[in-house]
């Protein structure tokens, strides 16, 4: 899909255990060079243009800020007209998710390596952002995945698969905190979003009391 970088559940931050972080970074670089940015009507295109000038300006400002801070990055090398809305995918190594201010709807990936002993603190930092739509974990240690699932404040949790593609009626979709508005779309509780509760309270004593109860008492 040509909007893969701007789906609400698209990957924005990847956390990689430090033991394999450098190897993963090198693989990521190779994979990124295969990405094709261009006309979304062409089957060979992976990523199309950013939606408007305001959006691409915000993304470019974020990229410029991280580059100015001297962050290590990898980027594809296609050239585009400066007036176009096309943008090369780019990945930055950063130290903490705290360095990201708000959502970045575009082809920007933030790469963070971590120590296993820091996992609990990592989850706390993620929760502290206030956003909680999707999270994915790749691990063969199911107890560790369960630990993350229990602590992470996210609406959709994926294990050993991609993090997009929720299907209405099969997998309810929705987030928590700043990423949620209540019941999940596609789930049984979603219907409650379309109804309004209404209560009726009657002071029966004002009209002489409840006739049925009074009659039963007389019996």
Give the location of each predicted region.
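Basic phosphate/pyrophosphate-binding loop/patch that engages nucleotide-derived ligands
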Residues: 64-70
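Residue-level signal for inorganic ion chemistry
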Residues: 17, 28, 66, 107, ...
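Short beta-strand and adjoining strand-loop segment in the mid-core
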Residues: 13-20, 91, 179-180
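Cytochrome P450 fold signature focused on the C-terminal beta-domain
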Residues: 72-78
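Conserved C-terminal structural/oligomerization subdomain of aldehyde/semialdehyde dehydrogenase
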Residues: 33-36, 79, 86-219
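Short helix-loop capping/hinge motifs at secondary-structure junctions, enriched
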Residues: 20-25, 97-101
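Short, small-residue-biased leader/transition segments that mark boundaries at the very start
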Residues: 1-3
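Flexible, acidic loop-helix segments that line cofactor/substrate-binding pockets
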Residues: 5-13, 29-61, 78-86, 102-108, ...
């Amino acid at each position: 899909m040509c909007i893969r970088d701007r789906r609400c559940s698209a990957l924005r931050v990847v956390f990689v255990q430090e033991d394999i972080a450098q190897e993963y970074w090198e693989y990521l670089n190779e994979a990124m060079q295969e990405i094709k940015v261009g006309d979304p009507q062409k089957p060979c295109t992976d990523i199309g243009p950013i939606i408007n000038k305001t959006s691409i300006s915000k993304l470019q400002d974020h990229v410029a800020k991280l580059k100015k801070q001297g962050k290590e990055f990898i980027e594809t090398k296609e050239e585009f007209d400066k007036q176009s809305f096309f943008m090369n995918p780019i990945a930055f190594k950063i130290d903490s998710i705290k360095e990201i201010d708000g959502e970045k709807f575009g082809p920007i990936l933030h790469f963070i390596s971590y120590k296993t002993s820091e996992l609990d603190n990592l989850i706390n930092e993620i929760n502290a952002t206030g956003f909680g739509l999707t999270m994915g974990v790749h691990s063969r240690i199911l107890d560790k995945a369960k630990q993350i699932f229990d602590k992470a404040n996210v609406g959709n949790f994926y294990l050993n698969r991609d993090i997009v593609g929720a299907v209405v009626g099969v997998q309810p979709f929705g987030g928590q905190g700043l990423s949620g508005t209540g019941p999940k779309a596609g789930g049984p509780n979603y219907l409650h979003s379309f109804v309004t509760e209404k209560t009726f309270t009657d002071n029966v004593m004002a009209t002489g009391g409840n006739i049925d109860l009074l009659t039963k008492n007389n019996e």
